[in-house]
Amino acid sequence: MESLIFIAPLAGVISLVFAAFFAKSILKEDAGNKRMKEIAGAIQEGAMAYLNRQYKTIAVVSIILSFLILFLLDDGLKIAIGFLAGAISSAAAGYIGMSVSVRANIRTAHAASSGLEKAMSVAFRGGAVTGLAVVGLALLGTSSFYILYGDVDLVVGFGFGASLISLFARVGGGIFTKAADVGADLVGKVEAGIPEDDPRNAGVIADNVGDNVGDCAGMGADLFETYVVTSLAAMLLGSLIIGTYENAILYPLVLGSVAIFASIISVFFVKIGKEGKIMQALYKGVGGSAIISLIAFYFVTNSLMGDIRLFYATVVGIIITVLMVIITEYYTSTDYRPVKTIAASSETGAATNIISGLSIGFESTLVPTVVIVIGILISYFIVGGAADAGIGLYGIAIAAVAMLSTTGMIVALDSYGPITDNAGGIAQMANLPAQVRKVTDALDAVGNTTKAVTKGYAIGSAALGALALFADYRSKVNLGGQSLNLDDPVVLAGLLLGALLPFVFSAVTMSAVGKAAFEVVNEVRRQFREIPGIMEGTAKPEYGRCVDIVTKAALHEMAMPGFLAVLVPLLVGLILGPKALAGLLIGLIVVGFMLALMMDNGGGAWDNAKKLIEDGNHGGRGSEAHKAAVVGDTVGDPFKDTAGPALNALIKVVNMVAILFSSLIIHSGLF
């Protein structure tokens, strides 16, 4: 059984090989005419310039933190090396995804001239590169450091590095993409009355760059981190029950390995049938990945663990994944009541649109929360949690690992979104034939749904993963002679601070988007006013000015959320003690999960309500209802693409800080 540990790094390498294979196949596709290449080149240049500047900024922070880890912790050198490796791996996943995404967009636009099937194939393969790179690097890094160190506690540094990069990528990318999007929409659609992706809008290139920065690199880093820390949490909890299950640490890694093979196989399932239904084709891949993974999990569990109850926990994880996807699609798709309600409310103005959108966002927390609660209880008790709490908590962690078995496909779906969005923008700006735009519009409409669905999945997996991380922190606190009681005022104080943190964090990120969007709006207005011929199409806007504005804003504003995530748990732990920090973690997980659900689903519903009106309903484009829906969409944009997704990263970073510095915190504090 010992040799099975090497299946994990091998699976990681194979995943990266297939990612390279798909990337090479995309680059062989035709990149279109000169005008298309000019537009795509501007998007590519802006995206890579931002990513390079972001990583330089993060590198400075990472080096400072690595020295703190080196000098403050036992085995600091090993943990610091792991931390830097985790940060580099997460950055590499984002870099690979971004590099392919900004090259697949133009090829998708050109392929649209050959029809829907060809264009969809190029876009999905582009997404698959990011998906396979994310899971490959995550499993390769986690397993390699465990093999190298032989102690799962020392692998925590790798998880912390992945978490920190994810937070910065989510916050910085979210500020960039939504400041550009909101600014471009408010002036272009509402004031100037020009369509989306119109080349006369100075913010249009920044908007297209932002799609890649936020939805490709951002989501890639987010799910890379979730994959790493959830696997790590299961391994940490497994180390506590090694007397019952000798392979408890190895089991999550083997599950991840077979799931990678399932994802690779399932990529080839994604083909449009005779009906021409794009979403159905994409769901074939996700469904195939889940089913193949479950079959493999059954044999792995029987041979490695000898306890069928653990297989049942993996089934729970897969069911949660399916339900989260269905629920999110219900609340964010144009086919169902929530989005139709918001669209109808737009007829009476922006105020009723906002009220309706907030209501739908709040409502959307109900069913997912019930699903997660039931999943937690079943996975805890089905493995024997009533008799042994440690095994029950391990069952929850295994359910979370099973949820992540579809990560490769889920990231592929998410990255498909910005590729098709950019393809539509390139087609519009390059004045390609109406038939091409019709194909890219069909792809983009599905891309909006996939982006929303993957956010719901990310929140659910983050919640289960964070609960497993908290369980490990609690075990470390108990080992230090501390007990946790909810009637303890110190724990309650921590609970309130933890519940507060998501609101403060969201305030900072939302404010950053508002300030940057204000600058973009003023810049686009200035260009319309001062550069003659823009509206007539005889003069070219200064696209670079808007890209520069949002780049500077994103890099400047992402520092504060990062400091909050690292310093707050450290200060609470060092000043108030480990019990208060435990309370903070509980409050953060509960409130952060709910708030993220509300923001992601509410924002997605606002976005698609606008698109429903643009499709000719409730007066269509240019109507008063459309103007109200654009206002709602611009409120929902930072909800669903900045603050909401960043809360996932916040929850996991704070938990990783607590675990990493638990040995320091356990002997500190006033209480």
From Swiss-Prot:
Q: Where does substrate bind?
A: 178, 640
HAMAP family xref list: PPase_energized_pump
| Source species | Methanosarcina acetivorans (strain ATCC 35395 / DSM 2834 / JCM 12185 / C2A)
Q: How does it assemble?
A: Homodimer.
Q: What is this protein called?
A: K(+)-insensitive pyrophosphate-energized proton pump
What would be the name of the gene that encodes this protein? hppA2
Matching InterPro entries = PPase-energised_H-pump
Query: Catalytic activity, per the record?
Result: diphosphate + H2O + H(+)(in) = 2 phosphate + 2 H(+)(out)
Tell me where it resides: Cell membrane
Known cofactor(s): Mg(2+)
Residues that hold Ca(2+) according to the record: 607, 633, 637
Q: Which Pfam families does the protein's record reference?
A: H_PPase
Site (Important for ion transport): give the residues.
170, 215, 222, 641, 652
Q: How does this protein lie in the membrane?
A: Multi-pass membrane protein
Report the EC number(s), separated by commas if there are several.
7.1.3.1
Which positions does the site annotation Important for potassium independence cover? Answer: 451
